[in-house]
C-alpha cells in the first residue's frame, strides 16, 4: 500500500486512504480535460495504487481546452504519470447534442444550460460505455467538485455538494441517472481548490498552474458567446418593447439577451429597465422596471430525481436557479406528468413557490433542489 506523504495536506492523504479502501476492483478510467482538476484526480488514484487509464473526449476541432490544447496537456500528463491515454472522437455527438441544442434554444428565446446536458448525453454515460466495452473498466473518475454517498443496502447513491462551496459542481450533475452515478468517483469532492493547486504543484504536474477557463467551452472556442451564436444564427433584428407593447428600442437578435439583463440594452428610459421575457415567435425583447422582473413561482419540467424517489406530496426544499446563485427556500409541489415533455424519459414536473420573490428566473436554465448538502434532483425551468 502507498505510504502517505508527510508533505501533502491532511485532506489529500485522507482522500488517498478512502480510495485505497474503496470496495471492488481498483481499475478506473479518468476523464482528462487537460486541466489541473482532472490531472490531480488521475494522480491521486495512481498514488492510491489503482490501475488508472486516461480518457479524453475530443469534442471540437481547433483551439481551446476541449480541443488541441486539452488533448496535448492530457497526453503529456499521462506520459508523466506513466499511464495509458485514450482519445475518443465525440465531435459528432457534441455537435448534435450540444451545439444544435444551444442554437435551437437561443433561437426560440430561451437561455439553454448546456453543461448538465453535456454531462449526461456526451460525457459520463458515453465514457462509461467506452471504458467497459474497450477496456473492461467499469468505473470512471473525474475532477468534479462534488461528493457521492453510496447506499449500503443497494439503494440510491446520493449526490452531495462538494466541500468547497465556491467550486461545488453538483448543480451541473443533477441530471445523471443512478445507473451512471453509482459507477463514478469524485476524489476532489473532499478538497478545496487551493488544496488541489498545492498538491498538483507538490507533485510537479504540468497543469498545476494552468488557468481555468472562465467561460462556456463553446464561447472559449469561438472567442465569445456572441461570436458562437453569430456563426450559427442569422442576424434577426427586432423590437425591444415594454410589457404594454410600446416600442422603446431595437435589437440585433434575441439570442444576445437573457432574463434579468439591464446593461447593454441601448434603451434610454426614466428608470432602469430589465429583460423580463424573450418572445421567440414575435422576435421581441420585452423589458420592464426591476419590480416587474420579480416573481414568486416557477414551473420546472424534465425533472430528474437523483438522490430520492419522485415525491408524491409537496416538500420544502432549497433551490438554485443558476449556478452561482444562493439557494432559496421554496415549497415544491409535484405536478401531473406531461407526455409531450421534450425529454419523454423524464416526464416529472413540479411547481416551485418561493418564500421570497426571485429575480431573473430564466426559462431553459436548471432549477436544482437541495436538502442541506444533498442534491435531491432538478429540472429545466419552463415558465
From Swiss-Prot:
The EC number(s) this enzyme carries: 2.8.1.13
UniProt key word Transferase: yes
Compartment(s) where it occurs, according to its Swiss-Prot or TrEMBL record: Cytoplasm
Disulfide bonds: 118-217
GO BP terms: tRNA wobble position uridine thiolation
Molecular function terms, GO-annotated: ATP binding; tRNA binding; tRNA-uridine 2-sulfurtransferase activity
Catalysed reactions listed for this entry: S-sulfanyl-L-cysteinyl-[protein] + uridine(34) in tRNA + AH2 + ATP = 2-thiouridine(34) in tRNA + L-cysteinyl-[protein] + A + AMP + diphosphate + H(+)
Keywords: ATP-binding, Cytoplasm, Disulfide bond, Nucleotide-binding, RNA-binding, Transferase, tRNA processing, tRNA-binding
GO cellular component term, pick one: cytoplasm
Residues engaged in binding ATP: 31-38, 57, 143
Site (Interaction with tRNA): residue numbering on this chain: 144, 365
Region (Interaction with tRNA) location: 167-169, 322-323
Organism superkingdom: Bacteria
A Pfam family: tRNA_Me_trans_C
Active site: 118 (nucleophile), 217 (cysteine persulfide intermediate)
NCBIfam families: PRK00143.1 (NF001138), trmU (TIGR00420)
Function: Catalyzes the 2-thiolation of uridine at the wobble position (U34) of tRNA, leading to the formation of s(2)U34.
Homology family: Belongs to the MnmA/TRMU family.
Name of this chain's protein: tRNA-specific 2-thiouridylase MnmA
Lineage of producing organism: Bacteria, Bacillati, Cyanobacteriota, Cyanophyceae, Synechococcales
Gene behind the chain: mnmA
Amino acid at each position: 500500500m502507498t505510504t502517505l506523504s508527510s508533505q501533502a495536506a491532511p485532506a489529500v492523504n485522507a482522500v488517498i486512504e478512502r480510495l485505497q479502501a474503496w470496495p471492488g476492483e481498483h481499475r478506473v478510467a479518468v476523464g482528462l480535460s487537460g486541466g489541473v482538476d482532472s490531472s490531480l484526480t488521475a494522480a491521486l488514484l495512481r498514488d492510491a495504487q489503482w490501475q488508472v487509464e486516461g480518457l479524453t473526449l475530443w469534442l471540437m476541432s481547433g483551439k481551446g481546452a476541449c480541443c488541441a490544447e486539452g488533448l496535448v496537456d492530457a497526453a503529456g500528463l499521462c506520459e508523466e504519470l506513466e499511464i495509458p491515454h485514450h482519445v475518443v472522437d465525440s465531435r459528432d455527438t457534441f455537435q448534435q447534442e450540444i451545439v444544435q441544442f444551444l442554437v435551437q434554444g437561443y433561437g426560440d428565446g430561451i437561455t439553454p444550460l448546456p453543461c448538465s446536458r453535456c454531462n449526461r448525453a456526451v460525457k459520463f454515460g458515453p465514457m462509461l460505455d467506452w471504458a467497459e466495452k474497450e477496456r473492461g473498466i467499469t468505473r470512471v473518475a473525474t475532477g468534479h467538485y462534488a461528493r457521492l454517498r453510496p447506499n449500503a443496502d443497494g439503494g440510491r447513491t446520493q449526490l452531495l455538494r462538494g466541500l468547497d462551496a465556491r467550486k461545488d459542481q453538483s448543480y451541473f450533475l443533477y441530471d445523471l441517472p443512478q445507473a451512471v452515478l453509482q459507477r463514478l468517483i469524485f476524489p476532489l469532492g473532499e478538497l478545496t481548490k487551493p488544496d488541489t493547486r498545492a498538491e498538483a504543484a507538490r507533485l510537479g504536474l504540468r497543469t498545476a498552474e494552468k488557468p481555468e477557463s472562465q467561460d462556456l467551452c463553446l464561447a472559449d472556442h469561438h472567442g465569445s458567446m456572441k461570436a458562437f451564436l453569430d456563426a450559427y444564427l442569422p442576424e434577426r433584428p427586432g423590437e425591444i418593447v415594454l410589457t404594454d407593447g410600446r416600442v422603446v428600442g431595437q435589437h440585433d437578435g434575441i439570442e444576445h439577451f437573457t432574463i434579468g439583463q439591464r446593461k447593454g440594452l441601448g434603451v434610454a428610459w426614466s428608470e432602469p429597465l430589465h429583460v423580463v421575457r424573450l418572445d421567440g415567435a414575435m422576435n421581441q425583447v420585452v423589458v420592464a422596471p426591476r419590480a416587474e422582473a420579480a416573481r414568486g413561482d416557477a414551473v420546472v419540467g424534465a425533472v430528474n430525481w437523483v438522490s430520492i424517489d419522485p415525491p408524491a406530496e409537496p416538500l420544502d426544499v432549497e433551490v438554485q436557479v443558476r449556478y452561482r446563485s444562493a439557494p432559496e427556500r421554496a415549497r415544491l409541489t409535484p405536478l401531473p406528468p406531461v407526455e409531450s415533455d421534450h425529454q419523454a424519459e423524464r416526464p416529472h414536473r413540479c411547481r416551485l413557490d418561493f418564500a421570497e420573490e426571485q429575480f431573473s428566473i430564466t426559462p431553459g436554465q436548471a432549477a436544482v433542489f437541495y436538502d442541506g448538502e444533498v442534491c435531491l434532483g432538478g429540472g429545466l425551468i419552463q415558465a
